[in-house]
UniProtKB/Swiss-Prot annotation:
<dbReference type="GO" id="GO:0003735">
    <property type="term" value="F:structural constituent of ribosome"/>
</dbReference>
<dbReference type="InterPro" id="IPR001787">
    <property type="entry name" value="Ribosomal_bL21"/>
</dbReference>
<dbReference type="InterPro" id="IPR036164">
    <property type="entry name" value="bL21-like_sf"/>
</dbReference>
<dbReference type="GO" id="GO:0005737">
    <property type="term" value="C:cytoplasm"/>
</dbReference>
<dbReference type="InterPro" id="IPR018258">
    <property type="entry name" value="Ribosomal_bL21_CS"/>
</dbReference>
<dbReference type="GO" id="GO:0006412">
    <property type="term" value="P:translation"/>
</dbReference>
<keyword id="KW-0687">Ribonucleoprotein</keyword>
<dbReference type="InterPro" id="IPR028909">
    <property type="entry name" value="bL21-like"/>
</dbReference>
<keyword id="KW-0699">rRNA-binding</keyword>
<keyword id="KW-0689">Ribosomal protein</keyword>
<dbReference type="GO" id="GO:0019843">
    <property type="term" value="F:rRNA binding"/>
</dbReference>
<comment type="subunit">
    <text>Part of the 50S ribosomal subunit. Contacts protein L20.</text>
</comment>
<comment type="similarity">
    <text>Belongs to the bacterial ribosomal protein bL21 family.</text>
</comment>
<dbReference type="GO" id="GO:0005840">
    <property type="term" value="C:ribosome"/>
</dbReference>
<protein>
    <recommendedName>
        <fullName>Large ribosomal subunit protein bL21</fullName>
    </recommendedName>
</protein>
<dbReference type="Pfam" id="PF00829">
    <property type="entry name" value="Ribosomal_L21p"/>
</dbReference>
<keyword id="KW-0694">RNA-binding</keyword>
């Protein structure tokens, strides 16, 4: 059974036991989190969400991705700007899909 959930402005297809990375959620490691914004399951399609459906996941860890470098440059104008960014994420493992 699979489900499509909406979190952090993105849509993610999940199955039971799958590990997923999503945008940072305000929960601690070891807690459980319920996604109620379920767009579809293997047998139902929501309009926009499936009524009574939820996906329960356990938080594995909070972390930050690799650093990416943003470099702005204009030739002949002595304009250079270098900036780094690390995106925060939450790693989850899907425990159950209901509905």
């Amino acid at each position: 059974m699979f489900a499509i959930i909406q979190t952090g402005g993105k849509q993610v297809k999940v199955t039971e036991g799958q590990e997923i990375y999503v945008e940072k959620l305000d929960v601690e490691a070891g807690d459980t989190f319920e996604f109620t914004e379920v767009l579809a399951t293997s047998d139902k399609i929501g309009h926009p969400y499936v009524e009574g459906a939820k996906v329960v996941a356990e938080v594995i860890k909070q972390g930050r991705q690799r650093k990416i470098i943003v470099f702005k440059y204009k030739r002949r104008k002595n304009y250079r700007r270098k900036q780094g960014h690390r995106q925060a994420y939450t790693k989850l493992v899907v425990k159950s899909i209901q509905g």
